[in-house]
Amino acid sequence: MGYKISIDAMGGDHGLNTTIPAALEAVKKDSNLQIVLVGDHHKIKRALDRYSKVKKIKLPVLQRIAIHHASETVGMDESPSIAVRKKKDSSMRVAINLVKDRTVDACVSAGNTGALMATSKFVLKTINGVDRPAIVYALPAFNRETKQLSKTYMLDLGANVVCTSEQLFQFAIMGSILAASSKGIAEPRVSLLNIGEEEMKGLDNIKNAAKLLQGCDFINYNGYIEGKYIFDDTTDVIVCDGFVGNVSLKTMEGSLRLIESLIKKTIQESSLLMKIPIVMALPIFKKMKKGMNLDSFNGASLLGLTGIVVKSHGGASANAFETAIYEAIKEIKYNIPKTIQESLEKVL
């Protein structure tokens, strides 16, 4: 089955220097993939020619990449309302329009998160039964019994700072559907992020959401989960409001940088004698770093829309942006918006 994805080629901190090499690698590895690069035609063509020569991309592969001109770009610090009202020919807006027109199956952007969410909601609209879309991200999770690395989906990560219990309930349904499709499990475990595991703890909206989940046969509700267990693979879906989710995600990113800095500092300050066993352990450190590498988990989905939109980290590398493209492909294959719609019709 073939699939086509539009890419906001100008979006993100690094723009074409990230999106073009990522697109080339993705189409080279997946013969079923076609990509439409949206943005300044001249700049994209020039970058495409340069990177295709560096990567030695053959003509049959290049023929699966098209360029769609857009005259404007959305800045990383631009107001979402301005992006929606005034930037109607931005690379972001045009890339999303292609999803609406069914010219492509999904859109991937590393652009301004607020603008992407506002534009996506304005153009694509939400699925019936969904009040607001949510940003969901796959986090690394380690199973202490099997010693295997897995994924836990967490939402919302910043789209909705304040949420009602009904909205948290909707997020749980959407996250459960994504986890079931992505992880290939029939009944994903769903948990609410809270300050404790006891039933009486937490804000009223969280406690009321718990009651809704307990009464829903569709959801395999796993109770509350504390922040210290996020990486323990004790659940498949973690639900929270966008404020808590965004703070949690950025705290995780900062923690990983701290660990990496401490390891480097320890190595640099070690004596020559101590560096010998450290050098011998380098393969272990490299393997550990690979497991902690957030590039392999890049690609946050905007769940609850009638079309597929995947948000890459703004400062993502080419490898990380490529991962976001594969996340979009996965959602295309499982037709996530349609599955969410059908499930909500049964539950609500």
Curated annotation (Swiss-Prot):
It is found in: Cytoplasm. It catalyses: a fatty acyl-[ACP] + phosphate = an acyl phosphate + holo-[ACP]. It is an enzyme of class 2 (transferase). Keywords: Cytoplasm, Lipid biosynthesis, Lipid metabolism, Phospholipid biosynthesis, Phospholipid metabolism, Transferase. GO terms for molecular function: phosphate:acyl-[acyl carrier protein] acyltransferase activity. Its main location: cytoplasm. Pathway: Lipid metabolism; phospholipid metabolism. Signal peptide: none annotated. GO terms for biological process: fatty acid biosynthetic process; phospholipid biosynthetic process. NCBIfam families: plsX. Homodimer. Probably interacts with PlsY. Belongs to the PlsX family. This is Phosphate acyltransferase. It comes from Francisella tularensis subsp. holarctica (strain LVS). The lineage of its organism: Bacteria, Pseudomonadati, Pseudomonadota, Gammaproteobacteria, Thiotrichales. The gene is plsX.
